[in-house]
Structure formats: C-alpha cells, structure tokens
Amino acid sequence: TPRKSIVPRTHRNKSVIWDTTFDRIVKEKPKGVKPMYVSTSEIVQKANSIVAQCGTRDPLRIARDLGIEVMYYPFNEQRGAYKVLMRNRFIFIKNDLHPVMENIVLLHELGHDALHREEATKVGGFKEFEIFNMRDNRMEYEANLFAAQISLSDEDFLELAERGCDTQQIARTLNSDINLVALKADTLISQGYRLRQQEHCTDFLRYDK
C-alpha cells in the first residue's frame, strides 16, 4: 500500500511530501517551453489579487467584474480568442464547448488579459491556434499557470493531496482538467511546497471540446 503524504491542515508548513500516487512524474518542465517573461510568483500574486478583488473564482463573474465582454461564436476549430479593440477588451468563446473546457478557455483568456494585454493590443489579439501551444509560445504557459491558480485554490488542492489523490482524482473532484492540476502543482512548488512535479501536455487545450 503506497504511503500517503501528510499535509498540515493549516497548509502553512511548506515541508509537504507528495506521495508517488501521481500517474506520471517528471523532474523538468516539458522540453521546448521557453523561459517565462512573467515569473511564476508574479502570476500567482496577480491571480490571487484578482480572486480577492472579485470575490470569486468563476471566470464569467471575473470577466464581468473586470469589464471584459464575453461573446460566444460558432468557431469551426479554434476554442477562443482574446482581443482589445479601441481599449475595449473582448473574449470570444466557441459556443459548443463542454462546460469544463469552456471554463478553462475563459480562464486562459483571462490570463492573457491580466498578463499580456499590451502584447495583445499590439498584434490585434490572440487566436486559439496561435496561443494554445505552450511549446511554441512562452505566453501560453503563463496564461495556463494563471488559469490553474485562479481555478484551483491552494486549500482544496492540498486537502486532496493529503488524502493521497492522484491528478485524475483531483481533477474530477474539482471539476477541472488533469493538466491544470499538474500546472497547479508547479505553482505550489514555486512557493516552496515539496511536491513532485507532474507531467502535462504542452498543447492540452487543443483536444476536442
């Protein structure tokens, strides 16, 4: 029987050992991910500030509170887009996405708004086939880290880790995606928690709906 990790209930002690019940373990970030221009600590701080400001982790409510208009469109392939038009910010979402994927795309686009608004303004916005591949674009990894930090609270994540849950169990319990769970582990590792770094797909937002 695998030994379960013990996470203090207060979660203030960062000497946490993650049990090897996770499905796949890696020691490095996926090859090809370019160095971030926004540090993980800055992303975590920005995401936490927005959650505190809006009082919610719901991406639609966050978008509304931040003055971003969310519009649904029958895209053929792309999942979403972020644009700044005449200083007005827009998020476009494919109108037939699975609810979990819809939330992930919304959170991802909110990450671009929070972290990359200036770049988006310069290039006329971001589209799915340009932005959802972390292997080719450093901003994608940053936006996905932001999405993981917004959607998954430290407390919920660590409580499930204490129970010995693996990535799939955590994702299922928190109505999330295993890749966001792995990215959440990255953010906690950066804060000093001794978790085993988890493998995640560099283009996970490309899967169907």
What are these regions (language model features)?
Residues 1-209:
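Active-site hotspot residues in diverse enzymes, especially metal/ion-binding acidic/histidine motifs
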